[in-house]
Amino acid sequence: NVKTSRPQHLTAKQVISKTAKHFQIETEEICSSKRSKHIVIPRQIAMYLLRSELHMSFPKIAKELGRKDHTTAIHSIEKIEKDSKLNPAIRDNIASIRESLYN
């Protein structure tokens, strides 16, 4: 197994775009205020990936995704961390998006 290192050129926009593409939704929907489940989960996963892959601060993550308050990012990331331990589909989605970011 070859461990891939994070490319220096990876941006927040790329993470958001790849997440949207994976879930077959528009990038604008991830950044919107819509609360339907098929948009909320990809948004939360995008926040999680921005934190884990780009090591962004909570306020910066919130700003990237059009959120007013960084506590939304904290809650979302904690939720995905918890859910990924219980739900293999969440883990698989995260792994698939990560793979698309690095290949």
Where are these regions (language model features)?
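AAA+ P-loop NTPase domains with strong preference for DNA replication initiators
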Residues: 1-39, 52-53
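Terminal-proximal interaction/regulatory segments of ATP-powered molecular machines
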Residues: 28-103
